[in-house]
A protein has these predicted regions:
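Acidic, glycine/proline-rich Ca2+-coordinating loop motifs
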Residues: 1-160
Length: 160
């Protein structure tokens, strides 16, 4: 499979022929919130330096959003130096408007309205947000800071 980038957490995925062309397409769901304010108050991406190191070690571009990979089966690409070819896929999640369904768990293609076309159903939700940066508001409070300052922490060396 050849794609320009991929979903980062890849929580759930589903294979379906969404165009009825005999080729299996792939949807992968992730955690991008639909609302901009939630995106901005969440730990969302790696810092640039970590992203750069990952790329130097050969990791592919990863984004925390849903991806819809449309199979372009007639566009076979030959791997140089081999006789192996594979299908190319186009990532159309943003074009299809399904890239941000919040903390998503499982996608399902099914004809829900009996119109003959497959609909995408995504189960999503999370109790509280473990990646929310709202703890910064609480740690600024004096009583919390005083409590943290009064504790004795033991220094433990990190294993090598």
């Amino acid at each position: 499979m050849s794609v320009g980038h991929k979903s980062r957490a890849s929580i759930g995925n589903y294979l379906a022929d969404i165009k009825n062309d005999g080729l299996m397409d792939v949807v992968v769901v992730d955690m991008m919130p639909e609302r901009e304010d939630i995106r901005k108050s969440s730990v969302f991406a790696d810092p640039f330096n970590i992203d750069y190191v990952k790329q130097r070690f050969g990791y592919h571009f990863q984004y925390r959003r849903n991806t819809l990979l449309l199979n372009r089966g007639n566009a076979l690409k030959l791997i140089p130096g081999t006789n192996t070819a594979f299908n190319l896929f186009s990532e159309i999640g943003q074009l299809a408007g399904i890239h941000a369904t919040d903390w998503s768990w499982a996608p399902l293609f099914v004809d829900l309205d009996n119109d003959g076309h497959k609909d995408l159903f995504v189960s999503n939700g999370i109790y509280r947000r473990p990646n929310d940066l709202d703890y910064l508001d609480h740690i600024k409070k004096n009583e919390v800071q005083l409590e943290l300052n009064s504790r004795k922490f033991q220094s433990i060396p990190a294993p090598i």
